């Protein structure tokens, strides 16, 4: 088995356990870290919507702060921390937009109210009042009546984080935690243990 395949299989195993754990609120939630062109770090929680050998996919408004940061600097990291399992996985890599057809397919499966919200929210921009947002929601709900498909806004899409580093961490007594990392180097993928 190739080392990247091995890392993805390990991720699938712990991700599956997190999905089944009753005390994990949302196993898909991860912290996305980006850095703007000016060097300011930014973090927020996103939801993983799929992963394979190409990378880890999430969806958002391209005009949001994270969309702008990724346009300026496509290097990013995500951290899955499943406290009830005492495990975490950190993935670093380069982010690219998903294909338009892939974004369309994901959008089509979203609940209608989320689709309307995707049109109505000017994500990360200032908001005069909650009433203004609710008015825009009502306007878009009228524009796209029940029973009709809500098209994907041009500013709404997905991103895929192609990994160059995947680190696994598991808590152990005495803070002698288990850590190991898969990294892509000039020679290909390598695997090594890390001190806690």
UniProtKB/Swiss-Prot annotation:
PROSITE patterns: PYRIDOX_OXIDASE. Keywords: Flavoprotein, FMN, Oxidoreductase, Pyridoxine biosynthesis. Binds 1 FMN per subunit. Substrate binds at residues 49, 106, 110, 114, 175-177. Its EC number is 1.4.3.5. GO terms for molecular function: FMN binding; pyridoxamine phosphate oxidase activity. Its cofactor is FMN. Pathway: Cofactor metabolism; pyridoxal 5'-phosphate salvage; pyridoxal 5'-phosphate from pyridoxamine 5'-phosphate: step 1/1; Cofactor metabolism; pyridoxal 5'-phosphate salvage; pyridoxal 5'-phosphate from pyridoxine 5'-phosphate: step 1/1. It catalyses: pyridoxamine 5'-phosphate + O2 + H2O = pyridoxal 5'-phosphate + H2O2 + NH4(+); pyridoxine 5'-phosphate + O2 = pyridoxal 5'-phosphate + H2O2. InterPro entries: Pyridox_Oxase, Pyridox_Oxase_CS, Pyridox_Oxase_N, Pyridoxamine_oxidase_dimer_C, Split_barrel_FMN-bd. FMN binds at residues 44-49, 59-60, 65-66, 88, 123-124, 169, 179. It comes from the Bacteria. One of its GO terms (biological process) is pyridoxine biosynthetic process. It is an enzyme of class 1 (oxidoreductase). Catalyzes the oxidation of either pyridoxine 5'-phosphate (PNP) or pyridoxamine 5'-phosphate (PMP) into pyridoxal 5'-phosphate (PLP). Homodimer. Belongs to the pyridoxamine 5'-phosphate oxidase family. This is Pyridoxine/pyridoxamine 5'-phosphate oxidase. It comes from Alkalilimnicola ehrlichii (strain ATCC BAA-1101 / DSM 17681 / MLHE-1). The lineage of its organism: Bacteria, Pseudomonadati, Pseudomonadota, Gammaproteobacteria, Chromatiales.
């Amino acid at each position: 088995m190739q080392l990247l395949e091995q890392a993805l299989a390990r991720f699938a195993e712990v991700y599956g356990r997190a999905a089944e754990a009753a005390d994990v609120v949302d196993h898909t939630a991860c912290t996305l870290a980006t850095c703007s062109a000016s060097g300011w770090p930014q973090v927020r929680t996103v939801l993983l919507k799929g992963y394979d050998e190409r990378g880890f996919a999430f969806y958002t408004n391209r005009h949001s702060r994270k969309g702008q940061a990724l346009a300026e600097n496509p290097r990013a990291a995500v951290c899955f921390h499943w406290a009830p399992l005492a495990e975490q996985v950190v993935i670093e890599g380069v982010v690219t937009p998903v294909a338009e057809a892939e974004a369309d397919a994901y959008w089509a499966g979203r609940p209608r109210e989320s689709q309307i919200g995707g049109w109505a929210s000017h994500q990360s921009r200032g908001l005069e009042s909650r009433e203004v947002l609710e008015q825009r929601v009502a306007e878009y709900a009228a524009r796209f009546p029940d029973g009709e498909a809500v098209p994907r806004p041009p500013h709404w899409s997905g991103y895929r984080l192609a990994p160059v580093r995947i680190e696994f961490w598991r808590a152990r007594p005495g803070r002698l935690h288990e850590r190991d990392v898969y990294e892509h180097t000039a020679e290909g993928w390598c695997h090594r243990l890390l001190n806690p």
